[in-house]
Amino acid sequence: MGASGLVWTLTIVLIAGLMLVDYVLHVRKTHVPTLRQAVIQSATFVGIAILFGIAVVVFGGSELAVEYFACYLTDEALSVDNLFVFLVIISSFGVPRLAQQKVLLFGIAFALVTRTGFIFVGAALIENFNSAFYLFGLVLLVMAGNLARPTGLESRDAETLKRSVIIRLADRFLRTSQDYNGDRLFTVSNNKRMMTPLLLVMIAVGGTDILFAFDSIPALFGLTQNVYLVFAATAFSLLGLRQLYFLIDGLLDRLVYLSYGLAVILGFIGVKLMLEALHDNKIPFINGGKPVPTVEVSTTQSLTVIIIVLLITTAASFWSARGRAQNAMARARRYATAYLDLHYETESAERDKIFTALLAAERQINTLPTKYRMQPGQDDDLMTLLCRAHAARDAHM
């Protein structure tokens, strides 16, 4: 497994301790973290991940350290894409701002448990089946294709997520109330003990993360077959996810090309896995069951490609006119959906805050070059959504 039982035990204790400290100091007391707090906490967890990488250099050598940092950076990038979906889920269910930290921490804990299971299943497949790399490579190429398709990006909207099988089953079989009760999971309604919608949100977040594991775990095994490093990179990237959510909440919509960058990364790793599978080929109908000479891609080269793609993706998202247009429309869609999903009991201050953000997004759309603005016959769904939000505002006033 690449590490002794003692090292595994110490690492698990460290991760569990960090999660416990995070809960006690930052989540147990209901509050919305300030930007300064989010920056400090995010920097702390990134620093811990880097210190762990330095420890890998000292005790394992530079080659293992490169593998760890490649896995950590890849999983961190994929996690940012996860955050976008978490943001859609939280907004579509109208989760109170004060309760969002608990939802995120639950999602992280659930993800850590499920992904650990996926890691060991993946390791078992690699060890016992010669064709496992072909399977992993194919999965990554399919995932890359889905991310690269515009329809794949649009499918991650609020209504699609709320219609998911997991949510429909939970909503059918669990007795839930219509309203939130702070950050509590249970409440009393009509003298009956019921679950609050917060539980449905946690189920949605946890269920969604299971789907994300299908691309993240094969991607990490494409960079290293060291199970311990895959686990450590996954754990440390997840630990900083809650703080990262509040830090880049307002920036997520700006990363409009992130999914395309991730598609390139997943496609690259998928091809790398296919090449490695061909190099060690034992499948009878491929080259008569003999290894196929292929180009070898080192982990250092993989890390370089990952860094370059992420830098280009980020720069293009922030500087291109098309990126600014997609950002404005994504923000308008998100705030309009959030406003329409508000309960009548929602405080006026929260309602006004969301509608003000919607107006700001609409103003940004109006300042765009004409060719990037919404035109008749295009983005009709968004225009309809905005009209509904304004009608709801007028009715509430």
Curated annotation (Swiss-Prot):
Keyword rRNA-binding annotated: no
UniProt subcellular location: Cell membrane
Main localization category: membrane
Topology relative to the membrane: Multi-pass membrane protein
Keywords for the protein's UniProt record, in alphabetical order: Cell membrane, Membrane, Transmembrane, Transmembrane helix
Entry's transmembrane regions: 1-21, 39-59, 76-96, 103-123, 124-144, 194-214, 219-239, 255-275, 301-321
Pfam families in alphabetical order: TerC (PF03741)
GO CC terms in record: plasma membrane
NCBIfam families reported for this sequence: R_switched_Alx
Family statement drawn from the similarity comment of this UniProt entry: Belongs to the TerC family.
Protein name in the entry: Uncharacterized membrane protein Mb2742
Natural source organism: Mycobacterium bovis (strain ATCC BAA-935 / AF2122/97)
